[in-house]
Amino acid sequence: GGSLLTLPFALRHPRDKAGVKWAVIAGVVLALHFVGFFLAMRMTTVAAGTALVALQPIFAALFVKLSGGHIPSKAWLGMIVSFVGVGLVAGVDLQISTDKFLGDLAAIISAALAAVYMIAGSKAQRTLETTTYTTICYFICSMTALPMALIAGYEIFSFSAKEWWILLGLILGAQLLGHSMFNSALKRVSPAVVSLIVFF
């Protein structure tokens, strides 16, 4: 839905091959992140799953550092404090059952994928405008997630009128105003710093 709304703006800007490649990678990784997140929500507690997915900034900082980037010392301190809090929340579930442990693991993998998505988005927007990037990324994400949903047997079209309005609200609010603003920030700020917003 979001890709269709941003398409008219994206068509106005040139498309660089390297940027498109990173946008496609970001779209695939974003879809896998969502799959991992919702899988985690089914297998572990919402509190633990959400907290573990919030490890995204730490993964982003590690990936940026490994690629030669710079992370401010204050950012590291903030992430360490957050990591301790996440550990206190997740540590309870690790001892309960195999399912919840696997759910926690899925959440951690989802966090790492979210970090990769942010870094890929940052690389894509070195040569692409944000509207072009989000159009490609959101479209690839939906096309990657669609067959997974169909194979899993989920109903993806038979919604009530109220549910369609809710979906429209999510597209306009959460996706275009929220998610796309994150992506726009990646043109100017390090992925690790942008990722810190998930803690607020």
Q: Language-model segments: which ranges?
A:
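Hydrophobic transmembrane alpha-helices of multi-pass small-molecule transport proteins
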Residues: 5-6, 24, 30, 55, ...
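Specific transmembrane alpha-helical segments of multi-pass solute transporters/efflux pumps
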Residues: 11-49, 53, 88, 171-189
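Loop-to-transmembrane alpha-helix entry segments
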Residues: 16-21, 50-53, 66-88, 100-104, ...
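Helix-helix packing/entry segments at the starts of transmembrane helices
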Residues: 49-55, 120-142, 172-200
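Specific alpha-helical transmembrane segments that line the substrate/conduction pathway
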Residues: 1-3, 29-30, 38-70, 110, ...
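Membrane-interface helix termini and inter-helical loops of multi-pass transporters
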Residues: 42, 88-102, 149-167
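Residue-level signature of transmembrane alpha-helical cores of multipass secondary-active transporters
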Residues: 22-27, 38, 50, 79, ...
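Transmembrane alpha-helices of multi-pass small-molecule transport proteins
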Residues: 1-32, 57-63, 113-120, 135-153, ...
